[in-house]
Amino acid sequence: MRVARILGTLEPGGAQLSALWLSAELRRHGVATTLLAGDATPAGLALAARYGLPADAYRVSDVLAPGSLQWTPAPDFAGWLGPRLADADLVHAHMVGAWWAAARAVPPHVPLVASEHNQMSWPDGDHTPQAREAARRVDMFFAHGPMVRAWAAGIGLDDGRLRRGRSSVEGLPAGPLPGLPSPRLTFAGRFREDKAPDVLVEALALVAAPPPAYLVGDGPQRGALIRLVRARGLEAVVHLPGWSYEPARYIAGSSVHVVPSREESWSQSAVLGLGLGVPVVGTAVDGLARTLGGGRGVLVPPEDPGALAGALSRVLGGDRPDPAPGRVYARQFTPRAAAAVYAAAYRQLLASRGNSGWASAARP
């Protein structure tokens, strides 16, 4: 089976990693993946190549703008995609800018699968009307969180085409990197407003004698984060080791792992912490509230450094959730389990190819 996988943006990030792990694991199911990207960074291209998936990108730049092809419909991108989809048996496009373009470019007989990994926050203008039109051509839609699922239902996809997205994590089990201090606190993710590393720094400033804190990742807020760390006098506490291919080795053995997000449909970072038996403190937003619910983690309000500081202090003081439920929960999110779900979905769509009326250019 030849699958063209299209990413609206290709950069080091959770949605991209999940798509790369999925593509690599689908090889076991006889799926050969061609990776295409709208906007890509050099680091994103290197990340894809690391998983044996050299990517063809429409645009490459060091920094992705808010109006990137993650969010923005672009007819020129659709035109670029057209000849690159000619040999695909199935197209799976991730992020609205990608599946909007794919809906224009995919041949009428080829199934189109779409995925959304994030809350629809529209940083550069709301394109819901364009998405509603493109959704007529989508044959199956995977939503990776409660809020994006509700949005997808609102544009007409809740008619048998809507599915719960299945993401995955890597790094279970893992041992800590040698030389890391104990106790320590960890964060792993993009340095962006939605991931709220700034809120974590503000919370650390309120914790009495905070332990060393390792904020693993990179992103556009790095400079602002460094300035905030200095302003709060936390230079000796906060460590910024940069992007890591093995964040689990920082998280393993940590005293507490923190997910302070303002928005979070599904957090690889939180699930990784749970799977490693590390206490996880996160915000009660969207899908993260579900992940850490049921006593698996500790939930606090978003954008509340005081509440976050209080929760961190309690966990560091020994008031920790039972790790067993979190470990059990995390086991279902392996790349192998995700690949089985998507391989079955792809085969279902391809088996329907000969059915009368299937895969028209657009639904009425």
Descriptions of predicted regions:
Residues 93-99, 116:
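Short His-centered aromatic/hydrophobic patch
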Residues 113-139:
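A conserved, positively charged/aromatic
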Residues 136-161:
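A short, active-site helix/loop in glycosyltransferases that binds the activated sugar's phosphate group
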Residues 243, 262:
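Aromatic "clamp/platform" in nucleotide-sugar-dependent glycosyltransferases that forms part
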Residues 279-282:
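Short hydrophobic beta-strand element within catalytic cores of glycosyltransferases
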Residues 294-305, 314-319:
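Conserved acidic donor-binding segment of nucleotide-sugar-dependent glycosyltransferases
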